């Protein structure tokens, strides 16, 4: 499967599964499952609720300009007390302490999407403006001795970086132009080119974004992944600048290739955000406390400049996809730089702090390769899909931080983190039943099983994190009873979702740990397709654990209101 085009809004909170998973809904047609989005009909997605700014003919070419805007309000209420186990982690307690009880989110969000089309050419732009009021004031942190940031001055203040990533910002998402042509006998051949910020996703990932082939193609929005119940893979990828070329010689084959001229890391929670479990990474990460918390001048490692891959390092890929009868098949090869960091530490750099005993920085591994295949077909009334992929030069879960004799250290040859060759596989099914007794709209089901396996360690085996296994697996499924036209133009659904890691503590994915997971249930009402209201309860399986289950105490009740025009 290939998915391209517009990104969904970064922080959409209450959007529950309505029974049509993103594998289908992204295109709006079941017949397009598994085919390329490079065909001319798919280059500019038709948005059913868009406001038409202009429609006409110029130089015998159809011209359309459409603007669609979604506005949204969401709020979260914490339902669990902070865990003592997690509060005792001096380098991961800010999120718990800042939001000890009560309302933890109060977000106003706007997502404008502009599409312009001139014949077979066009442009697509989207952005987001958001305001989350709890991050604009003070918080409830009551532990100045374990407060990691040092530039704010007060433990009840958020860092400016956290305010920007969680509190208020205006973000450009998609920004690309495209063009294409039909040629050959009866115009059956198609070639398209898209240039700019966009998402291109290969494979058949349904829920487990970081485990699939598409994990190498775009950064993940961890903020959305942690705040949207049962987030589907395509909902949490972010666009990057790239060139995408697609050639369709006939109705069976599609050849596609891309080159990315922009690299971006995953969007992590800001330090001290409600779902933050590490006080040292990314936005707002400033120091690691290494001495007794009771010491007012506690010893610390101070953060210095991170090591990111150079823009010209080369991230690219190619695929061959085919529709053979009822089967959609794909072969893929790609090379990418990691969007998630490893942690290095070393000698102190002068910064004027008396308790400075060392430095730390984030290093993003480079030159990872993925080779994979996917298949999708219908089995009776259900759609069944799967993929398998191997990764070379993959960074593994290590016992960080990794001590470096020199700064900046290497993110390629000579890496300090463990590296290996791995295998990943996923299988999923989607099914929507006919009407049932007491459920006239039927029930929608979506499920996926994901596994990963460490084939061999090629470097730094001694740095593997202890207590983990070479094979791990997890599952996620949703069940959604639907009631259509309860009142004129009003549909109601009751989505239920469960994620559970049932095998192993992965040496490849540090979030896949046996006995952990989450569950959610709620009610969603849709009026005239443009108004949505949802209430959701979400909580977590397993005992709180600093390494294995660091947000186990962050259960919440949420309300979401949304309108598209």
Where are the model-predicted features located?
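Extracellular loop and loop/strand-boundary signature of outer-membrane beta-barrel proteins
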Residues: 94-100, 159-164, 228-231, 273, ...
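Transmembrane beta-strands of outer-membrane beta-barrel pores
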Residues: 73-79, 129-133, 197-201, 259-265, ...
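Transmembrane beta-strands of outer-membrane beta-barrel proteins
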Residues: 65-73, 119, 123-127, 191-195, ...
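Outer-membrane beta-barrel "beta-signal"
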Residues: 530, 551-565
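Outer membrane beta-barrel
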Residues: 119-279, 474, 503, 512-517, ...
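Short loop/turn motifs that connect adjacent beta-strands in outer-membrane beta-barrel proteins
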Residues: 49-67, 80-82, 114-123, 136, ...
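Residues on the lipid-exposed face of transmembrane beta-strands in outer-membrane beta-barrel proteins
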Residues: 69, 110-116, 125, 174-179, ...
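Residues that define the transmembrane beta-barrel architecture of outer-membrane proteins
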Residues: 63, 91-95, 104-110, 168-173, ...
């Amino acid at each position: 499967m290939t998915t391209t085009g517009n990104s969904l809004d970064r922080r959409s909170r209450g959007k529950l599964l309505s029974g049509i998973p993103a594998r289908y809904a992204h295109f709006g047609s079941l017949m397009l499952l598994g085919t390329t989005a490079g065909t001319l009909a798919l280059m500019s997605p038709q948005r059913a609720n868009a406001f038409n700014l202009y429609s006409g003919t110029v130089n015998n070419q159809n011209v359309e300009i459409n603007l669609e805007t979604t506005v949204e309000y969401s709020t979260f209420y914490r339902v669990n007390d902070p865990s003592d186990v997690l509060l005792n982690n001096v380098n991961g307690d800010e999120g718990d302490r800042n939001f000890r009880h009560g309302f933890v989110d109060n977000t106003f969000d706007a997502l404008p999407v502009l599409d312009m089309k001139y014949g077979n050419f066009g442009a697509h732009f989207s952005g987001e403006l958001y305001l989350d009021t709890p991050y604009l004031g003070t918080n409830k942190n009551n532990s100045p001795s374990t407060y990691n940031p040092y530039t704010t001055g007060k433990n009840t203040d958020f860092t400016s970086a956290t305010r920007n990533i969680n509190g208020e910002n205006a973000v450009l998402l998609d920004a690309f132009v495209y063009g294409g042509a039909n040629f050959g006998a009866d115009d059956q051949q198609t070639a398209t080119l898209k240039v700019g910020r966009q998402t291109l996703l290969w494979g058949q990932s349904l829920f487990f974004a970081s485990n699939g082939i598409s994990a190498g193609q775009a950064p993940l929005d961890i903020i959305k992944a942690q705040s949207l119940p049962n987030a589907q893979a395509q909902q949490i990828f972010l666009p990057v600048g790239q060139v995408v070329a697609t050639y369709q010689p006939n109705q069976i084959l599609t050849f596609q290739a891309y080159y990315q001229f922009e690299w971006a890391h995953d969007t992590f929670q800001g330090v001290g955000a409600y779902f933050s479990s590490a006080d040292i990474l990314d936005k707002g990460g400033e120091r690691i406390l290494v001495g007794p918390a009771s010491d007012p001048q506690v010893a610390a490692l101070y953060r210095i400049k991170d090591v990111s891959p150079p823009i010209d390092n080369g991230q690219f890929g190619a695929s061959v996809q085919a529709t053979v009868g009822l089967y959609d098949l794909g072969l893929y090869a790609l090379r990418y730089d990691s969007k998630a960091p490893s942690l290095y530490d070393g000698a102190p750099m002068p910064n004027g702090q008396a308790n400075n005993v060392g430095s730390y920085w984030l290093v993003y591994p480079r030159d990872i390769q993925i080779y994979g295949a996917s298949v999708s077909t219908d089995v009776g009334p259900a759609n069944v899909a799967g993929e398998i992929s191997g990764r070379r030069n993959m960074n593994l879960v290590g016992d960080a931080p990794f001590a470096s004799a020199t700064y900046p250290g290497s993110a390629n040859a000579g890496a300090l983190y463990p590296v290996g060759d791995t295998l990943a596989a996923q299988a999923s099914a989607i099914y929507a039943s006919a009407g049932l007794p007491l459920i006239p709209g039927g029930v929608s089901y979506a499920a996926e099983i994901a596994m990963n396996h460490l084939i061999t360690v090629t470097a730094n085996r001694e740095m593997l994190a202890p207590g983990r296994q070479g094979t791990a697996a997890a599952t996620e499924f949703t069940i959604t009873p639907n009631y259509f036209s309860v009142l004129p133009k009003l549909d109601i659904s009751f989505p239920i979702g469960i994620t559970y890691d049932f095998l192993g503590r992965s040496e490849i994915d540090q979030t896949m740990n046996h006995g952990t997971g989450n569950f959610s249930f709620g009610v969603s009402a849709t009026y005239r397709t443009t108004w949505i209201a949802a209430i959701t309860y979400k909580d977590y399986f397993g005992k709180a654990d600093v390494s294995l289950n660091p947000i186990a105490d962050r259960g919440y009740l949420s309300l979401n209101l949304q309108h598209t025009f």
